[in-house]
Amino acid sequence: MLDRLNRKQSKERFVNKIPISTTKIDKSLEHTRRDDESNNAKRGVNPDESYSSDTSFTPTVVSGTEDAALTRTSTNRQRQGKSSFKSFFRTMSLKVNSKTRNKDRKTKEELAAEKALAELRNLPRNPLDLELNELHVASNFNEVRKIIDDIFIDENHDAASKAIRISTQNKSFSAMEKPYSLTKIKSLQTEDDYSLPITSFIIETLEENSIHADLSHNDNAITSTDILIEEEEEMEQEEEEEMLNYDDLDVISDKIDEVGAESSISTSNDRGIIANATANGPIIVGDSTESVDTSNIENRKLVVVNSTPDDHDYYATNDMNDNFITPNPSNESVETLAGVYKDFEVTNATEANTEAGKTTDINAETSNAIDAVADTENKVTAEDDATDTVNTGESMTDTTTSTTDNKNDKEVDKEVENAVDSNVTTNDTIPDKAANIDNESSSDNSIDATTANTTNTNNFNDAEVNTEATNTIVDNVTNDKFNSVDVSTTTPTATTVSGIPTADEMTNNVNTNRISTATVDSFTGKTGENYESFITNAGKDSNDNNADLKTPTNNSATTTTNTQSGVSNKKSNSKTGSSEQNPFQKKLMNYLNSLN
């Protein structure tokens, strides 16, 4: 059976671990679903009993594919136990000792490595056509963490500094920011964190983690950086994801063949990358071969190119200078690395604009310097002009002085006095007249006009004000009347009507007479009458001299009771001793009832 599975492993999936002994089934299987016609049910076997070797089921390998090629024809008893053994293998695979594992069978790590290498063989050919090292698969998760921690991230590259997501077969690891400034990551995906999913990768290291390659065994060169490829899915999902599916790789190969060799990526010869690719060019990961030329590794850069099914390619480098490989697709339909190429062009344009801006700033500073020099020259010229003016003034003064000296002192004084008097007279008379005339005429006219307008405005406004005041007075009067009625009828502090006690008096009187809460019949009122008589005669004083509130004497007559003069008129059918009560009596009844 095992040999048959080994022959089928390239096309079908199989259970990875099969226990040697099946004489005892785990008790957890007692909860598995069984048909009522199960052989166990017919034989009456207790699920807790151990199965003997002659009644145990033959292990049935279950295929997860639709055609179920490995599901062999079996008896009814074997078919009934198929689901049980499926769960059984799943449970026992966690308990099987590693020594019981079939040594001929490949481990999951080895199968994952084969899948990764198969994907790499089907990647598009690289521009430099370098060789790719065969991956060395690590043996435990701790080595993977060490590798992830050694990933160098440019601390100045904010987007890439967040995290690099490395997607291996089904497992994703996140490498957090490290204090290195070596690797810059770019991706075609427009994601915020610039995640770079790559199926396989080689990390170029410098001093911290250098790669030691044995060039004499180029195909089998092993680096000190071990890579673990591990599944992410749990045991239930391993049925679909744990085995290598060559059909998927064939699809990848077919899609690559459809693109055609004429659409492969080429690099610009103008940069001279091809000439120094072997000696100084970057290390390319993602070629169709299985080895990498690691010569002169200290001075070379890392480039990772990856292709995944139904996805774009990814490009990573830690250098943006001469060794940066510029993708130049020969066919516009090819999306491989096109986004990176555009980003690189944009980066160059941005840098060019930055340089142009710096040049502009320098030119502006130069212009400012020239302006400053010009200002200085103008200032000097202005100072020279001022000096010339002063000199001219001095010469004129000298001439005047010399002329004045030739005249008699008396004449000079007389001329000066006359000139002063003349000026004073002119200044005193002419401006005063002009000012008086202008001011008076303009002021008079403006004042008159303003006064007239003011008068008219005041007259008009007075009418409005009077009207508004009249309306206000009417409203206030109305409100006062309404308020007086409202206050007198609703507030307990209204003007007391003769003969009707206020609320406070009522409370005091009731408390004074000590209302009994045990029964209503025991109540003794203010006048010494019983409860019913007191309620009927409510509102009377002790002398029965209430002029405003009269108690009807006719038991059958319907009268109008004036409860409060000027406030409200209410009609009540009052009968002595009847259940009909006026509003005051109702309020009093409610109050008394509330005391009980």
From Swiss-Prot:
Tell me where on the tree of life, at the top rank, the source sits.
Eukaryota
Q: Biased composition, Low complexity: where in the chain?
A: 434-461, 551-579
Q: What induces it?
A: Expression is increased with increased iron.
The Polar residues compositionally biased stretches are 49-63, 71-84, 534-548
What's in the keyword line of the UniProt record? Transcription, Transcription regulation, Virulence
Q: Could you tell me which residues belong to the region Disordered? A: 25-84, 378-411, 424-461, 534-596
Annotated knockout phenotype? Decreases virulence.
Q: Which GO terms describe its biological process?
A: intracellular iron ion homeostasis
Record's compositionally biased regions (Basic and acidic residues): 25-40
Function statement? Transcription factor involved in iron utilization and virulence.
User: What name does UniProt use for this protein?
Assistant: Transcription factor IRO1
Q: Tell me the organism.
A: Candida albicans (strain SC5314 / ATCC MYA-2876) (Yeast)
